């Protein structure tokens, strides 16, 4: 398996994610994929390669410097739509907060005593319900938004039924019960803790990365 798509990230869980997505056939030629919180575009690159020229990839990143890198990297990719926007629960504007590294960039204002954040700018925001309302089906949405998971999920309730899979990175323990309810009950997904390699149920602890999908005989774990 070629993991060069991930490039800058290189986490073991990311490699597992790519393997699972490919093995389960969750992303195919001609389909639509979304990378929310693209950072340097590792997943965007994998998605674009998987869906081919006939497919479509939406790539959203809030940090201007990182977005500039994405524009350069994917300037010749006609199947990628680049968005310097926050994916959120409303269409409007969100504040951008950042600490000493890109890993702390978020729209929630959350920081730590070791790496506090401050407001560094503003960015336009859009709901996935709005962005994807004209798509007939979405193969997969990857969400890595440094604690704004609930905002993204609440903003995609209208398009959840036509979304086949989610890959979501979880950050705050206090948000996990709500996230778990949305994924399992509201959206009706099967969910899998990638790091622990086990199914997620109502009693499961928060995973770091969670793969969610609509199970059939062809894509069971």
Where are these regions (language model features)?
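Phosphate/nucleotide-binding beta-alpha loop and adjacent structural elements of enzyme active sites
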Residues: 1-221
């Amino acid at each position: 398996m070629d993991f060069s798509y991930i490039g800058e990230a290189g986490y073991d869980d990311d490699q597992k994610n790519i393997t699972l997505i490919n093995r389960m056939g969750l992303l195919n030629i001609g389909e639509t994929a979304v990378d929310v919180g693209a950072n340097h575009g590792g997943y965007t690159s994998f998605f674009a390669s998987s869906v081919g020229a006939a497919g479509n990839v939406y790539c959203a990143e809030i940090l201007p410097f990182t977005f500039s890198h994405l524009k350069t990297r994917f300037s010749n990719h006609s199947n990628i739509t680049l968005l310097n926007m926050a994916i959120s629960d409303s269409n409007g504007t969100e504040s951008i907060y950042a600490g000493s590294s890109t890993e702390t960039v978020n729209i929630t204002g959350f920081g730590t005593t070791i790496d506090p954040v401050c407001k560094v700018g503003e960015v336009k925001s859009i709901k996935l319900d709005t962005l994807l309302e004209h798509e007939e089906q979405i193969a997969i949405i990857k969400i890595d938004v440094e604690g704004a998971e609930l905002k993204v999920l609440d903003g995609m309730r209208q398009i959840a039924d036509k979304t086949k899979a989610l890959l979501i990175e979880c950050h705050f323990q206090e948000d996990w019960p709500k996230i778990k309810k949305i994924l399992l009950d509201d959206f009706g997904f099967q969910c899998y803790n990638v790091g622990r390699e086990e199914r997620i149920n109502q009693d499961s602890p928060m995973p770091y990365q969670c793969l969610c999908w609509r199970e059939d005989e062809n894509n069971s774990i």
